[in-house]
Amino acid sequence: MKPTARSRRAAAVSLAGVAALVLSGCGSESDAGGDVDGSVTLGFVNGANTHFHQCLLKSVEETAKTEKATLYSANSKQDAGTELSNIEDMIARNVDALIVQTVNVDALEGDIAKAKSAGIPIYLTSVATSDLSDVLGVAKVDLKQAGALDAGWIEKDAAGKDVKVGIVAGAPGAASDLLVGGFKGALPATAKVVANQPGMFNPAKAQDVAENMIQAQPDLDYAFVANEEMAFAVRKAFDAAGAEDVKIVTVNGTDEGLAAVTSGEFSATVANSAMSIGQTAVKNTIGLLNKDKTVDKIANIPLVLVTKDNVSEAPQYCPK
């Protein structure tokens, strides 16, 4: 913790009271069990409400409690303006460090500048900017590689045949753009992307997209879906249209997703543990604040391509 944290906390009491009111609709406080005046105080700004984000929040909360840190949290609900407002509110609460799961990589520049001007370190999860000089650290997921792993499975399964591929992306920005970019970039020349539409990380929207996709492309061979929640809806739409043979590859590695791989509903998923990201973010933020030389600024979260053959190797996705 920075030496000035106690004095900054005292100076911002009135602002913190205002921030508590501002955050009451979208944030929460978790006193993790330590002495509030003597422990690290962290602010976690989450990006959305998908299953991934819910598991990430749970992991951050549980790890903060274990580390005896006080935690404030807020949700930006896929809106970059709300994200910056949440960061401003956390600054007013005078946290010792911010942990941010951004809604959009382009929003990070403003986030980092705002935190820097307030003298508060910022730690990023999942994605990062190319310039990390003003960042405390990052728990980084190579989302391009996640997409590429799914594309590699298709290349192997297609075995040189000409195939048609559909993409159900998430919401434009951050995770979805990186996933889809990595997937498209790694597809073999024999795989043609014939449809690419955003499902907005919303199962109902994804199902509608899939219904239109299979109607327009009845001979579709494969579909890449940007998360498992949407993938279940896409599977439902394809099956209802008699397209049970379309093979779906996706990303997450939830218990439900692994069961779908086992049953054959999904052909493959890339396990990207929200629990590991949250644990790493909290522990490394505290370690870096304490100038622990054993803690790396950049922590790479491992990815695992999961098929029927290696379901048991998938990491735990969400805290129980």
Predicted regions and their residues:
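A residue-level marker of the well-folded mature domains of exported/periplasmic proteins
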Residues: K2-A12, A19-L21, C26-K320
